[in-house]
Amino acid sequence: PIAGSMVLAAILLKLGGYGIIRMMQVLPTTKTDMFLPFIVLALWGAILANLTCLQQTDLKSLIAYSSISHMGLVVATIIIQTPWGLSGALALMIAHGFTSSALFCLANTTYERTHTRILILTRGLHNILPMATTWWLLANLMNIAIPPTMNFTGELLITSALFNWCPTTIIMLGLSMLITASYSLHMFLSTQMGQTTLNNQTEPTHSREHLLMTLHLIPLMMISMKPELII
């Protein structure tokens, strides 16, 4: 099932954003005020998805709702039809495609060893799988969108585009980003820190898992260094 989750979060979810980009090309660019209800709905949906993430106890559900919240920002900025907004939407879709797929991969790595996806039962893994903890930290920092990652570039462009269109949107954007940072750190601390609940022998991380995570994060870092490849 994990392969399906990775493909769904990385590719299929972004096809909706691509479809909206193509659809908006035939609509007038000067009448963006008529799309105000849809923009407010997209931003409000992103906040609600983020709040839903905070109350999740299942690791895969948390990552899935995280993908939904990011797509809310993408939809809102596509609708206003500005060059910066479109560039930010493309950047965030590509960056979050890598990030969410990597998080699903790490969730499966954890599940194969603990046989549970409940956050409170997977804690203390930094003592058992220290290298996996490093991957968890990198993936969560990218999900938070810290500089100089591509996620940060995308969210910065989205924030600039929406703020130029309507300064009030900065309140909803700021709240969404704050909650994103909260649940990302909560996910990392819940799965990696604390006293472990595992009593049996746990196998170490395999080379194929390290390779898979490297193939997720290295392209993202390379695109971050040369963003003009996609925007």
Swiss-Prot record:
Record GO terms (molecular function): NADH dehydrogenase (ubiquinone) activity; ubiquinone binding
Residue intervals passing through the bilayer: 1-21, 34-54, 63-85, 89-111, 128-148, 169-189
Keyword Oxidoreductase assigned to the entry: answer is no
* Family matches, as InterPro entries: NADH_UbQ_OxRdtase, ND/Mrp_TM
User: Which key words are in the record?
Assistant: Electron transport, Membrane, Mitochondrion, NAD, Respiratory chain, Translocase, Transmembrane, Transmembrane helix, Transport, Ubiquinone
This protein's membrane topology, according to the annotation, is: Multi-pass membrane protein
| Superkingdom as given in the UniProt entry | Eukaryota
Subcellular location, principal? mitochondrion
Which GO cellular component term is one of those annotated? mitochondrial membrane
Entry's localization field: Mitochondrion membrane
A Pfam family of the record is Proton_antipo_M
Query: Biological process GO terms, please?
Result: ATP synthesis coupled electron transport; electron transport coupled proton transport
Q: What is its EC number?
A: 7.1.1.2
Family assignment?
Belongs to the complex I subunit 4 family.
Protein task: Core subunit of the mitochondrial membrane respiratory chain NADH dehydrogenase (Complex I) that is believed to belong to the minimal assembly required for catalysis. Complex I functions in the transfer of electrons from NADH to the respiratory chain. The immediate electron acceptor for the enzyme is believed to be ubiquinone.
Q: What is this protein called?
A: NADH-ubiquinone oxidoreductase chain 4
Query: What taxonomic classification does the UniProt entry list for its organism?
Result: Eukaryota, Metazoa, Chordata, Craniata, Vertebrata
- Tell me what gene encodes this: MT-ND4
